C-alpha cells in the first residue's frame, strides 16, 4: 500500500461526448498516498464555446466564470505529470477517462499507461446493500460531507474519501472472500487484481474473527437463536393490568409521546378479540400509533398462550419497520424478552449450496460477475440471506432466480458448520412470540400441505385493505411470453452454452445414450418457433380490437362474446403449443429415469447441473399447465384478460386469470380455520360502514367485531381542501385542454414557498402528457420534476429523491395513492387530478361489475363507488402523517361538487375546511402561504 499512488479525477463538461465537440469546463484531482489525501488540484477550463443553460444550472459554472481561464492545453502537461505512474480513479470511469484521454491527445500527450479504478463498480461490490451509488447517495450512506455536487473539486474530494472507505473495506475482508474476488477480477472494469493480491498477502495467515467457512468462501458467523424464556408466574397478561403501569414507560421510550386514547382503545379491542376467539376489523387513522396498538396485546397473548401470533403485511417495507422501529419499543415495556422474526417465501433467501456451484461457473456476462462479487462480500455481513438487503444490477436479478432457495435446497445445503438461511429463518420463527410475514406467504401457506409458518390460530392482518387483492393475485394465474422465452433460453441448444449442451456432455462422460438430446433440441426449437407465432398472433388479435386506443398498455377482456373465429385460431395455437410442451416433457421423463439411476452419488457439481436441468424442464411443465388452465380451464367465477405492450415487441403479451370473489375462498380456507383474525388499516369503511369490506373479505357469516377509531389530529386547523371553480371537466373540454389546465394549476401551486407537491393520477397516459406540458417551465424555475415511469428509478428511489429535494413536484399513479409517508415539510400539497374510479374497461373490475348486475345489485353503487372512495381516502391520507403536519389538498375533478355521488367523497374528507376558489383566490392563497 505504501508504494501505491491513486489520482482521483473528476471533470465537469459541456455535454457527454468529446468526439461530438463537448469540452471540459472544470477538472479536479485529489492524490492519495499511504492511505490519505496528500495533494489537491483544481482548475476551471475555458472551453472556447458557450456553456449550455442546463449545464450551468446543474454545475453552477457560468460562461463568465470560465471566459478568462486557460484552455485545457495550458494545463495538459500538469495533468499528464499528475497521472504518470498512478492509478486513475473516477466515479463512472468511462466518462472522466474519455474526456481526459481525448483532451490530452489533442494537446499532444499520450495518456500514461495507468491502471483504472471505477468507484461506481467498486462501491457496488463492497457496499452491496446501499440504496444507490450516485456520489450524493454514497456520501449520505457513508456520512461524508458533499457540499457542492456537480462541481469537480467537491466531487473529486468526496470520490477520494469514498475510495478510501472502499480500500479499508477490502482490507478487512476474510482471506477466502478475497481469493474468490481475485478470481472474478479479470472481468471487472476496474484493474483490481494487484490490489487484491496485496490484501490477500496481508490476510493470508490472519484468522479474522466473526466468519466461518462454507466451501470456498466465507460467511458471517450466525448469531445465536433466542430461546423462549419462561415468564414471571406473577405477571398479569391482561391488557388492563399492563396499561395501568406502562403509560409513563411509553412516554419515556417514544419521543414526543402524548397519551393516545385511540391507541389504548385499539389495544383493548385486539386483546378482547383474541380472548373471545373472534374476528375483528379496526380502522385506525394515522397518528394513533396503530402498530404499537396491536403489537402490545399480541405480545401479551403470545406469552400467555405460549403460541405465536402471526402478523401479516402487504409491503416488505412495513415488515422491516415493525421489526426495527416499533418492536424495540414494545420489548422495552416488558420485564421479559419478547422475541420476533420475519419470515418470507423461499425465493427471498440465498441457497449457499447453489451459490457455491454457480460461483465457479465461467461467466462472461458482466452483470452476473458483478452479482457474484456482491454476494461474496454480502455473505460476510448478512445474518438473514434475504435478497431484500441487496441492490442487484438488472442482470443480477436473473442470476438470483438460479441461486434462490427451493424445496431441494435443504437436502443439498446441509453443512456441519452452517445452517441454510431459510432453515435458520424458519427455526427463529418457530421459537418466536411474534412472526412477521407477508400476505403472499400467508396465503401460500394456507393452501399448502408443507407448512412454512409456525402453527397458530391468532393473526393480525395489517394493510388489510390489500388483503382481498393479495388473495386474488395469489389464487390467480399468469402466463407471459417473456417467462417462456427465459425458460427456453436457460435450457438452450446443443450449440450454445446452456443446460442442454452441458447435460449432453455429462451423459457422454458417463457413457449414457445421448440420442434423446438431438430430438429434445429439435422439439425445443419447434416450441420456440410456435411460441413466437402464438404470442405474436395474440398481440395482433388485441391490437385489432383496440385500434383507436393510443396507449402503450392495451387490455382485452376474454369472455363468451369475444370468442369468435379469430379467437378459435388463438385457442388452436395454444393447443398446439401445449401439445409440444407435453411431448417435450415425455422426452425428458425418459432422460430423468436414466439420471435417477446413474447420476446419484456423483460430485456436487454434477448433481447441481442435473438438478437445475430437471427444475427447468419441470418449469416448462408447470407453464404448460398454467396455459391450459387459462385457455381451457377457466370458469364463470374468474376474469380472464390479455395485456399487451402496443408499442413494444410483437410478442410482448401477458395472459391473466383471477377469481371474482376471493372472499368466498378466504372464508372457507382461512377465516373458518382460525381462532381470531384482527384486520386493520387506515381505510376500511365507506360512509362510516365496514359492510363493503366485510362482504369483500368473506366475513359476513362470521359477524366480526368492528371499531372505527377517531383521528387524534385537528384536521380543520391543519388541512385546507380547495376545489378550483374554473377547472372544466374532461367531458366538457376534451383531454388536450384538460391536460393543459391540470399543468396550469400545478404551476400555480408550485409558486408557493419551498413547494413539495404530490400529484396523483389515475392514468399513466395522462401523467405522461402533463409531464410533457410541465417539463420546460419546471426546468427553468429550478423545481425538480419527478414522474413515475418517466424520470427513472423505482417508486422507492423517486420517493427518496423527492424527500431530499428542497423544491419538487412528484407525478404518481397507483403506487403513490397509498403506502407512502411524507412527514413534516417533506410534503406541502397533494393534488388529485381525477377521482380514482377504476377504468370500466379493466377486465377484473368489469367482471366484478357484471357479477353484481347478475345478482340484482347496482354495480356502480356496490363496486365502483366504494372502491373509489377507499382509494380517495388513501390518497388524502398521504398529507398528514404525524402531529404538527400541515398542508393543502387540491381536487381538480369538478365531479366532487357536480355529481350526486360527489357527496361521498366530500364526506370522506377528514376536514370541514373545504373551499371552492376562483383562480385569483387560489393565487392569493398561494401568495399568502409564500409570505
UniProtKB/Swiss-Prot annotation:
Pfam families: Helicase_C_2, RNase_T. Residues 7-162 form the Exonuclease domain. It is found in: Cytoplasm. One of its GO terms (cellular component) is cytoplasm. InterPro entries: ATP-dep_Helicase_C, DinG, DinG/Rad3-like, DnaQ, Exonuclease_RNaseT/DNA_pol3, Helic_SF1/SF2_ATP-bd_DinG/Rad3, Helicase_ATP-bd, P-loop_NTPase. A motif (DEAH box) lies at residues 462-465. Belongs to the helicase family. DinG subfamily. Type 2 sub-subfamily. Its EC number is 3.1.-.-. Keywords: ATP-binding, Cytoplasm, Exonuclease, Hydrolase, Nuclease, Nucleotide-binding. The keyword Heme does not apply. The gene is dinG. Residues 250-510 form the Helicase ATP-binding domain. 3'-5' exonuclease. One of its GO terms (molecular function) is DNA helicase activity. Disruption phenotype: Cells are marginally sensitive to methyl methanesulfonate (MMS) and sensitive to H2O2. This is 3'-5' exonuclease DinG. Its main location: cytoplasm. ATP binds at residues 284-291. Residues 741-897 form the Helicase C-terminal domain. It is an enzyme of class 3 (hydrolase). PROSITE patterns: HELICASE_ATP_BIND_2 (PS51193), HELICASE_CTER (PS51194). It comes from the Bacteria.
